[in-house]
């Protein structure tokens, strides 16, 4: 049976190769924590693909929130990624509220609602991608304050927007458009033009 560290590493290798290869450059003792963080991110980011409608997805995100907040101990202990991320949070004194905001932001993924403004998109990418970079920096600092919060914020938005643009055909095929309505309007385009 595969241990939680190997399980998380396999998820990241299979589902997030960019972060997998980047993690190989990290010090060996930090890699299990990073793989747990990125496996958790993969788990919540792919929920839409594993459900047929939004409500079951919201239930899964609620389960993750409860696990992160210290509830569902037995269930979390039996789930390799949940067990690993709870351990990493504890070992590195990671802020649980950042993880909770990540799960709350991922509710947007479950619906095809338009994103009204650039500010709304920045909020979503900040709570998902920027938070992930910031948490990784804390892990790399051994649980200490690494500095660079503002840089992590900007880097996360840039990384996420690049990913969203790269995935535009995939998202459009399922009825989602992450380009804010105000940006489309400035260009004389409408959301339906991309679907």
Language model features with spans:
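Acidic catalytic motifs of isoprenoid enzymes
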Residues: 1-157, 161-195
């Amino acid at each position: 049976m595969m241990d939680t560290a190997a399980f998380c590493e396999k998820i990241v290798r299979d589902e997030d190769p960019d972060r997998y290869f980047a993690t190989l450059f990290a010090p060996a003792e930090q890699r299990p924590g990073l793989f747990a963080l990125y496996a958790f991110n993969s788990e919540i980011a792919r929920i839409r693909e594993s459900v047929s409608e939004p409500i079951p997805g919201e239930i899964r995100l609620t389960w993750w929130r409860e696990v992160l907040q210290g509830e569902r101990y037995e269930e979390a202990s039996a789930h390799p990624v949940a067990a690993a991320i709870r351990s990493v949070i504890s070992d590195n004194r990671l802020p649980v509220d950042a993880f909770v905001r990540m799960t709350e932001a991922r509710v947007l993924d479950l619906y095809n609602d338009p994103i009204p403004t650039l500010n709304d998109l920045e909020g979503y990418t900040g709570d998902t991608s920027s938070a992930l970079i910031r948490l990784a920096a804390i892990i790399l600092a051994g649980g200490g304050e690494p500095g660079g919060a503002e840089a992590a914020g900007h880097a996360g938005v840039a990384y996420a927007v690049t990913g969203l643009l790269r995935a535009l055909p995939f998202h459009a095929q399922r009825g989602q458009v992450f380009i804010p309505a105000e940006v489309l309007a400035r260009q004389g385009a409408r959301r339906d033009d991309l679907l």
